[in-house]
Amino acid sequence: MDAKLLEILVCPICKGPLHYKKNEQELICKPCRLAYPIQDGIPVMLEDEARKLPAEEEVE
């Protein structure tokens, strides 16, 4: 994932910062508790495509 792209991407819902999880290939929004997938190196920034993080899953 390109570092410059990570700097400008924000959560489409709350406009908050995203955190890159390399192993899971996801961008995490901590306040919304959503994980946006990265497919073929392209972040899919659609709310309908995001995975809701369960309460028990730790958000780094």
Curated annotation (Swiss-Prot):
Disulfide pairings: none
GO cellular component entries: cytosol
Organism domain of life: Bacteria
InterPro entries referenced in this protein's UniProt entry, alphabetically: Trm112-like
Stored HAMAP family: UPF0434
Family membership noted in the UniProt record: Belongs to the UPF0434 family.
UniProt-recorded name of the protein: UPF0434 protein Mfla_2088
Organism: Methylobacillus flagellatus (strain ATCC 51484 / DSM 6875 / VKM B-1610 / KT)
